[in-house]
A protein has these predicted regions:
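SH3/SH3-like (including bacterial SH3b) beta-barrel domains
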Residues: 14-24, 29-32, 80-94, 100
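Sec/Tat signal peptide C-region and signal peptidase I cleavage site
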Residues: 6-11
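Boundary regions of SH3-family modules and the immediately adjacent low-complexity/disordered segments
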Residues: 13-68, 113-137
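Short polar catalytic/cofactor-binding loops
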Residues: 24, 73-74
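Short, charged beta-turn/beta-strand-edge "cap" motif at the junction between a beta-strand
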Residues: 102-108
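Bulky hydrophobic/aromatic "packing anchor" residues in well-ordered structure
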Residues: 76-78
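Bacterial N-terminal signal peptides
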Residues: 1-3
């Protein structure tokens, strides 16, 4: 996805994003609805049957969504614990002209995102990262 709706949890409170979870488990942003279908936005807009689908509200505090490097053409460290003095266990990069690397958001506490990148769990300082309800992949 070339564009994403990223929000900085550090700069302002992030409002939960209304998501539709389809019968296949795919999550898309809610746009509207009819009597029997949800209008959603994933890579493009489309329609999902209400039957077998559900609505969820995603936010970093609920451990939903994705985290990526805030700095254009930069990188941020993923730390073992919510402390910049702890060991670095990974990084998220944002290379100009490419889709930024992302990690699954597992929560937000005291200015730190808890993330999972390729099975490695760690922490990213919220002021150095963006949060999005949509996957970047």
């Amino acid at each position: 996805m070339a564009a994403m709706a990223c929000r900085s949890a550090q700069a302002q409170a992030v409002k939960p994003v209304k998501m539709v979870i389809g019968p296949d488990g795919m999550a898309c942003e809610y746009i509207g609805e009819t009597a029997d279908k949800y209008h959603v936005m994933c890579l493009d807009d489309g329609w999902v049957d209400k039957k077998g689908s559900r609505i969820e509200y995603w936010s970093p505090e609920k451990g939903k969504g994705w985290v990526c490097c805030r700095k254009a053409d930069g990188k941020v460290n993923i730390y073992k614990s919510a402390d910049a003095k702890s060991a670095v266990v990974g990084q998220l990069t944002n290379t100009k002209g490419y889709i930024p690397e992302s990690a699954a958001c597992m929560g937000l506490e005291k200015g730190w995102y808890k993330v999972n990148k390729d099975g490695v769990v760690g922490y990213v300082k919220a002021r150095t990262a963006w949060w999005s309800a949509k996957s970047l992949d």
